[in-house]
């Protein structure tokens, strides 16, 4: 919950998340015991681990990913599960589909903390080229009180923004008198979501103050997206269609290997059954051999 509210908490222990993530995790691990993916030693060679998950779900786009290595970095935004699956089905139905047509199914990133994406050109660039700078803003409303005062209530913040750091930044700007008109800042976030309350002075102009918040704080920020991923052992930047195509190809390989595994298992079983049939047809001879042994 602390992570969902943008409080910058560390990653939760397995026991905190396993119940909610179990259905999706089972889809990611489905058929892993049927030789569907290659196995390799882990970091200390004490165990074998999958080189990649079988993954019935296109999790790279759904969950997003961020990371940095020598000479490269990736920053893939999360997407809506239903939209990504619709886009994947569209690609399967029409392998020659264009990126523009895929965008009819996948409208854009789906940031869990909410906020507003300003300008779709950056999203289009991301899907066409694999790179894009997405401008985001938090969402806020202005409430007028009978006393003549007003308050700004922030209920959504940009993705990956640490709420605590945002509050600290606003407090510092007020102290430095770069953000005037705020008399109090309260964090009323809870299970219902994010709620930051900024009490304003009578002399404050709410809309001007809100614009200054977007200008001087991370309430207005940019998500530098780059869809870099490992494809056949090599890192490369991919557009939307290429990412989905890699997933479809991967699933084809998984299903092929699963089918071969089940066929080999059935053949082994058939070999045993053939032997049993021969034994049943020659029961007297089998009994004689056993007695004489």
Specify the residue positions occupied by each region the protein language model found.
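Generic, well-ordered alpha-helical scaffold segments in large soluble proteins
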Residues: 20-31, 60, 64, 72-75, ...
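Long hydrophobic segments that form regular secondary structure
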Residues: 141-185
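Preference for bulky hydrophobic residues occupying beta-strand positions
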Residues: 138-140, 155, 196-198
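Long, charged, helix-rich clamp/arm modules that form nucleic acid-engaging surfaces
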Residues: 1, 6, 10, 106, ...
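Short beta-alpha junctions and helix-cap segments that line functional grooves
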Residues: 55-57, 72, 122-124, 169-170, ...
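Solvent-exposed "coupling" segments
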Residues: 127-140, 188
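Catalytic phosphate-handling regions of large nucleic-acid enzymes and associated NTPases
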Residues: 1-133, 195-197
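Generic alpha-helical secondary structure
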Residues: 14, 18, 81, 163-167, ...
């Amino acid at each position: 919950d602390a992570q969902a509210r943008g409080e910058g908490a560390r990653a939760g222990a397995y026991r905190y998340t396993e119940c909610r993530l179990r259905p999706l995790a089972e889809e990611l691990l489905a058929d892993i015991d049927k030789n569907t993916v290659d196995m390799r030693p882990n970091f200390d060679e004490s165990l074998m681990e999958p080189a990649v998950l079988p993954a019935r779900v296109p999790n790279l786009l759904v969950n997003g990913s961020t990371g940095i290595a020598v000479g490269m970095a990736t920053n893939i935004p999360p997407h809506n599960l239903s939209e990504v699956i619709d886009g994947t089905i569209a690609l399967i139905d029409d392998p020659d589909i264009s990126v523009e047509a895929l965008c009819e199914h996948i409208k854009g990133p789906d940031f869990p903390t909410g906020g507003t994406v300003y300008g779709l050109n950056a999203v289009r660039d991301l899907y066409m080229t694999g790179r894009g700078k997405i401008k985001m803003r938090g969402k806020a409303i202005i409430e007028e009180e009978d006393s003549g005062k007003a308050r700004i209530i922030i209920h959504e913040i940009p993705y990956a923004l640490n709420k605590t750091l945002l509050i600290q930044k606003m407090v510092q700007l007020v102290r430095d008198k770069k953000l005037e008109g705020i008399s109090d800042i309260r964090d009323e976030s809870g299970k219902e979501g994010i709620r930051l309350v900024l009490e304003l002075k009578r002399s404050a102009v709410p809309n001007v103050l809100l614009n200054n918040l977007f200008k001087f704080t991370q309430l207005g920020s940019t998500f530098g997206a780059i869809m870099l991923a490992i494809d056949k052992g090599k890192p490369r930047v991919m557009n939307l269609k290429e990412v989905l195509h890699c997933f479809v190809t991967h699933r084809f390989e998984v299903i092929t290997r699963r089918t071969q595994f089940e066929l080999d298992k059935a053949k082994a079983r058939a070999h045993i059954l053939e032997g049993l049939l021969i034994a049943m047809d020659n029961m007297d001879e089998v009994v004689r051999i056993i007695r004489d042994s």
